[in-house]
Amino acid sequence: MLDSFNREINYLRISVTDKCNLNCFYCKPGNFQEFSPGDILTFEEILEVVRAFLPLGLKKVRITGGEPLVRKNLLYLIENIAALPGIDDLALTTNGILFPRYARDLKSAGLSRVNFSLDSLNPDKFRSITGGGELKNVLEAINLALELDLTPVKINTVLLRGINLDEIDAFVDFIFRYPVHWRFIELMPLNDREKWQRQFVSVKEIVEIISAKYKLIPGKTVGGAGPARYYEVPEALGTIGVISPLSNHFCEYCNRLRLTSTGKLRLCLAKNQEVDIKSLLRSGISQEELTGVLREAILRKPRAHEFGDKDFLGTMANIGG
C-alpha cells in the first residue's frame, strides 16, 4: 500500500521482547525498565497483526528485540509467519549469542536470512561494550549462518568515537575472509544526547577513513531493500555498507512500520506517534477492522524523522531494534 507520500509500505519490523542477554550501553540506559510479561503481545496477537497487514501488501517481516532468541518458543512464530501467503522475506536480527543453539531449527521453520549486531572484534572490548558477552559465540553464529545459507548475512556495527572507531580496519578485513555484508550505522540520539555528541561518527567520516586505504566501488543493493548504501572492495568476498539515519536520512524511501513488543505500532522510529494495537486486539477487534486501522496508520506515516526534536525520548530495547 502507498502512503500519503507515495512510498510503498510493505515491511513490518516486529519486536518480540525488550529483554536481552547482553547489556550494550547505547541500547539500554542505566535507568532502563523492562516490561512485565502481561505487557507483551502474545504470538497469536502478533500473528493477528501480520494477517491483517497482508491485504495491504505486506511482503517483508523482520523479527527483532531486545534479543528475540530469549523469547521462549520463537520458532512457533517464525514457522507461522513463514507459512503465510505473500511473505517472501522473513529475517531475524540477533546478537548471535544464542543463535548456534537454534540456527538449524530456524532454517527449518522458514527463516530467510539473519543480521548480526557486532560492535567489536576484540574479545575484551566486546565484553566491555556488551556487559559480558563472548565474541567467540558470535563468530560461531556467523559461520553457521553462512553454512546454512541464511543469506545474505549482514553484520551491523554502530561506530562510536573513542570506543570502536579504531577497529575499522579489522571490520573491513573481515569481508576479505568471509562473504558477509558489513554495515556501519550512525549512532542515533535516543536517550543521552550529551554522550551521543561525543561518540557520534558520521557516514561521511566513515567512508573517508575506509577509502583512504581501500578502493570503494558503489555497489548494488543487497537483499532486503533496506536503507544501506553498499560499496564493493576489489578482491573482497563481501561488501561494506553504510546507514546514515542522521547525516543523510533515507526517509524518502522508507517502506516500514514497527510493532513494539508491547503492541504499539510505531509509524516512524524517531517519532512518538503510535497506534495502540494491543488495546484494540484485547477489545475484540475483527481482522477486517484491524486492516482498516493499519490502512489509516499508513496514511498518517510522517514524511521524515525528527531526531532533532528535544521531546523525543526512547530506547532501542523498548522500541525494537
UniProtKB/Swiss-Prot annotation:
Which superkingdom?
Bacteria
Q: What class of enzyme is it?
A: lyase
Cofactor(s), names only, from the UniProt record: [4Fe-4S] cluster
Note on how the cofactor is bound: Binds 2 [4Fe-4S] clusters. Binds 1 [4Fe-4S] cluster coordinated with 3 cysteines and an exchangeable S-adenosyl-L-methionine and 1 [4Fe-4S] cluster coordinated with 3 cysteines and the GTP-derived substrate.
Outline the extent of the Radical SAM core domain. Answer: 4-220
Locate the residues binding S-adenosyl-L-methionine. 26, 66, 117, 188
Task: Name the EC number(s).
Answer: 4.1.99.22
Pathway the protein takes part in? Cofactor biosynthesis; molybdopterin biosynthesis
**What does the function comment of this entry state?**
Catalyzes the cyclization of GTP to (8S)-3',8-cyclo-7,8-dihydroguanosine 5'-triphosphate.
For this chain, the family text in UniProt reads: Belongs to the radical SAM superfamily. MoaA family.
Protein known as: GTP 3',8-cyclase
